[in-house]
From Swiss-Prot:
It comes from Citrifermentans bemidjiense (strain ATCC BAA-1014 / DSM 16622 / JCM 12645 / Bem). Its cofactor is [4Fe-4S] cluster. Binds 1 [4Fe-4S] cluster. This is NADH-quinone oxidoreductase subunit B. GO terms for cellular component: plasma membrane; respiratory chain complex I.
Length: 170
């Protein structure tokens, strides 16, 4: 049994987009940015009862290791430059989740010091409403983010086949 023997039925063919999107959606590493009471619900979501690890979601403490940021709570204008800096430190591709009424729309705080929705500063991919949203809502929002990632179009070209011989470039 050598490498040259035909593989028969054991060949997998897929597009590179599908393969990369499957890997990205199956390993979301969010950075937590808890600013208010929503952070408590985010911690509860990461606990054993909801077990985000089974979906490949592992919280990271460093923006350089994260590909998603969860903005949970009230964003003040004084905190906004810090959030932008953290977002810029994240590698591409990156996604933003707005968790809670305050992060989505400013909540009940209609004052000069509160940002009326984080989407004024960052491109938000998923909004999770509630004050504060329950852990089930955050889990649902992260699953919706996985669906969005699975359907993204990348800049990769054709399909690849595992088991195909690739000729060296001349």
């Amino acid at each position: 049994m050598g490498v040259d023997q035909p593989l028969g039925e054991n060949i997998i063919t897929t597009s590179l987009d599908s393969l990369v999107n499957w890997a990205r959606k199956s390993s979301i590493w969010p950075m937590t940015f808890g600013l208010a009471c929503c952070a408590i619900e985010m911690m509860a979501t990461g606990a054993a009862k909801h077990d985000l690890d089974r979906f490949g979601i592992i919280f990271r403490a460093s923006p350089r290791q994260a590909d998603c940021i969860i903005i949970a709570g009230t964003v003040t204008k004084k905190m906004l430059p810090v959030i932008k800096t953290v977002y810029e430190q994240m590698p591409e591709p990156k996604w933003v989740v707005a968790m809670g009424a305050c992060a989505c729309s400013g909540g009940v705080f209609d004052t000069y010091s509160v940002v009326q929705g984080i989407d004024e500063a960052l491109p938000v991919d998923v909004y999770i409403p509630g004050c504060p949203p329950r852990p089930e809502a955050l889990l649902y929002g992260l699953l919706k983010l996985q669906d969005k990632i699975a359907n993204e179009r990348n800049s990769f070209g054709s399909s690849i086949g595992l088991g195909e011989r690739l000729e060296p470039a001349a």
